[in-house]
Amino acid sequence: MSSKLRDLIKTVRSCKTAAEERSQIAKESALIRTAMKEEDLESRQRNVAKLLYIHMLGYPTQFGQMECLKLIVSPSYADKRIGYLGLMLLLDEKQEVLLLATNCIRGDIMNSNQFIVGVSLCAFGNICSTAMARDISPEIEKVISHSNPYIRKKAALCAIRVLRKVPDLTENYIPKIKALLSERNHAVILTALTLIIEICEMDSTQIIHFKKMVPQLVRILKSLTSSGYLPEHDIGGVTDPFLQVKILRLLRILGQNDPEASDAMNDILAQVSTNTDSTKNVGNAILYECVQTIMTIESENGLKVMAINILGRFLLNRDNNIRYVALNTLSRVVNTDIQAVQRHRNTIVECLKDPDVSIRCRALDLIYSLVTESNIRVLVRELLNFLLIADAQFKSELVAKLCIVTEKYAPNKRWQIDTILRVMSIAGNFIPDEVPSNLIQLISSTPELSSYAVQKLYLALKQDITQQPLTQVGLWCIGEYGDLLVADKSQLPKDEDGLSLNVSEQAVIDIIDLIFRHATTTQATRQYSLTSLAKLSSRFSQSSLQRIKTMIDNYKQNINLELQQRACEYSTLFDFDKKASILDRMPPIEKQEESPHIGNKNIPTQTPPQQHYQQQQQQPQQQSSQFGSILDGLDSPTQSSANSGNNNNNNNKQGGNAMSLLEDIFGSAPTPTSNGNMNNNNNMNNMNNNMNNNYAMGGMGMNNNNNNSMGGMMNNNNNNNNNNNNNNNNNKSQASALLDIMGDLQLTPTPQQPQSQSQQALSPTNQTSVLQPVPQPLTFLVYQKHGLNISYECSKPQPNNLSLTNINMVITNTGSSPITNFSLQAAVPKYLKIQLLAPSSTVIPPNNSGEVTQVSKVLNSQQGQKPILLRLKLDFQINGQPFSDVPDTPLPSLF
């Protein structure tokens, strides 16, 4: 005979170790199984109760499911109560055993004993499946009109479960619901309101059936607010706050986008807002729901101001939860009436000093929404003060928002530059990458403030050179506007003593030298320093030139390849007759607009591009399109190599194109004038060959076929021409040096100059080529399997170079589980060249809650003749299970 439940609990509690507990549970489970086999009716109820306790401890109890079914068919209420409780805990709606309980539940719902009806409805509402909902729905419709309110309220809650499983049955319950609102029992009204809200949220077309109930709901709410003390419903001095909150929530749904229904609610909402006690938490709950209703429906302006004032009072509350919901609600309604929210600006700013990190975060978001042209100076000053004491987790986001509002609402460019410099000096290395580039673009596009900006940056560098983003911007500006720094004194800022600062060339070089030698200086900052020195060599006097050369020469043997390459190229550039034009001041930098698809969570699926576009008339192709794509940074060759005969022909043609490009830039190709120059050019040629080889070895997926890259083109071309004549060799050596120095500089081609017969024979322009009109950017779905969706956002970044295509791969996950260890690789045919960047993440969140992007650039050497075809290699895991696929993803013919 098994022990009692009380004895089992005492035994388990007295166990000293987990092993001892498992042993006791195993013994008791064995005794329970034995009793089940013997069909011991007296101990069945007690055994199921002990199984429930064992289940709560986390041990398996599946063997007791049939015992629960045997208990619910018993005529005894005590047996049914334990049986239904075991049914709810040991089974769920997916268990096939549950189908055996359908007839028993149907019979118990129609029982004359209200307690048996109650436990059966309770079990049905918790474990009802779709099939069971269809079978027992007629009984629920009957008991929802029962005379006993105890049964009616449970039936209304069961109706919610039925409609969630079978929404088609909604029409059957709407007539029954209207009668429930006429009840005097608050529990019945509360469950009826819950059922109405559920129907409206599931199907918005059903709202029209309940709009006629607005006057009735208003009367119920008015009676609750004006009634006296009711002990059975009073909570904290408020009459039935749960029912009031539920009515306000339903009024919010019925009054949305309905002026007539909203007008009927205005008076009662004003009454609730003014009469509810806000000193207790229960009153604040009603006020919060009332504010949400006022801001959602078509309420009067005065009522909205009252609601915002209530939220302002919430900000003064000592409870962090109330302050948080106030800030959260104000962030949502700030666009409705920003002037009313502005009245509480000081209180919102004070929330930045709150010790609770979540409140500080919400206050920061709200202040960002409150910034306008009239208060930009005040709020930015407060945000800068907060930036001084902000935690590291806030700084990056705060800096980004500060720069956005500064750019959007700045009263003038000078104030904008001062503010961003202040932000960068405070935030240090927490500056996002786009902030320095945006500041450089701002200074470059504002010539009248160039002198002022470079002087401010010089002063900032004198104070602190450990902030790398600020140091890099300062070095860029000093390199571009160093002559203004040492010459123009009219706008020079004052120091702390109010005296004008005199900046000499040696002082500028000293601070760059200090940056070189400082321990915190990164390699990227040293690269900026080398470029800045090279720029200053054409802006400073001859007395400073020797020191600049010495500082650059010190890095010609540096172990860092990038620093060594820059130093060698700049050192060679000093002897070049075109140095002044190459190192001249850059033209104003145009601000690049972000792609409209960036940050979109849902990528629209369009029809296949081949059906979307019509065939267009072809036009002659420009000769220099290939060079524009090469200079744009695409250096990686494809995974295949051509034969040696084709390599020689391609090298000759590319050499002719390189000379044509130089003629377009400088008017004519440079020619040697002495043997000394020839020797220097030969040295330069050897240096560039070494650099090109090093660069090729460091690329991703590089092979021996470099005829598609600028480095390989100049290398092979020079080697071929060394055996022919010195003149062409010198010209092409200088061309290679120029292209190495210019790096990613984008060049605009000019009309082609007349060529000699030999040049025309080597030039590809003697072949017939065509140019298609520029296709518009296009987004389309290319892969959809295992919940993984991949969309391509294709665009042509250069209208005069259709051979270059940018493909932004947007990867989303429609499944319910996250995709981990995601890897995407791409292979292309021989006539294509691809540069594939790393993905933004290797984890793709589920349910379309986020996206991963991976950018690729494709260069088509046979544009207009062969399409772009990418074969992807996908590897990922879902719940630890690996998946792999190799799909082909063609692009439209016009791309």
From Swiss-Prot:
Residue stretches of biased makeup (Low complexity): 604-626, 639-658, 675-687, 706-731, 746-765
InterPro entries to which the protein is assigned, alphabetical: Adaptor_Complx_Large_Subunit, AP1_complex_gsu, ARM-like, ARM-type_fold, Clathrin/coatomer_adapt-like_N, Clathrin_a/b/g-adaptin_app_Ig, Clathrin_app_Ig-like_sf, GAE_dom
Alphabetic keyword roster: Cytoplasmic vesicle, Golgi apparatus, Membrane, Protein transport, Repeat, Transport
One term of GO molecular function: clathrin binding
Keyword Membrane: yes
Residues covered by region (Disordered): 591-687, 706-733, 746-770
Record-annotated GAE domain positions: 775-893
GO cellular component, one term: AP-1 adaptor complex
PROSITE patterns: GAE (PS50180)
Localization per Swiss-Prot or TrEMBL: Golgi apparatus, trans-Golgi network; Cytoplasmic vesicle, Clathrin-coated vesicle membrane
HEAT repeat ranges, renumbered to this chain: 130-166, 167-205, 211-256, 301-339, 341-376
GO biological process, one term: Golgi to endosome transport
Domain of life, per lineage: Eukaryota
Pfam families: Adaptin_N (PF01602), Alpha_adaptinC2 (PF02883)
Role noted for this protein: Subunit of clathrin-associated adaptor protein complex 1 that plays a role in protein sorting in the trans-Golgi network (TGN) and endosomes. The AP complexes mediate the recruitment of clathrin to membranes and the recognition of sorting signals within the cytosolic tails of transmembrane cargo molecules. Also involved in early steps of phagocytosis and macropinocytosis.
PANTHER family per UniProt: ADAPTIN, ALPHA/GAMMA/EPSILON
Annotated family: Belongs to the adaptor complexes large subunit family.
Subunit structure as annotated in this protein's UniProt entry: Adaptor protein complex 1 (AP-1) is a heterotetramer composed of two large adaptins (gamma-type subunit and beta-type subunit), a medium adaptin (mu-type subunit) and a small adaptin (sigma-type subunit). Interacts with rhgA.
Protein name, per record: AP-1 complex subunit gamma
Native source organism of the sequence: Dictyostelium discoideum
Taxonomic lineage of the native organism: Eukaryota, Amoebozoa, Evosea, Eumycetozoa, Dictyostelia
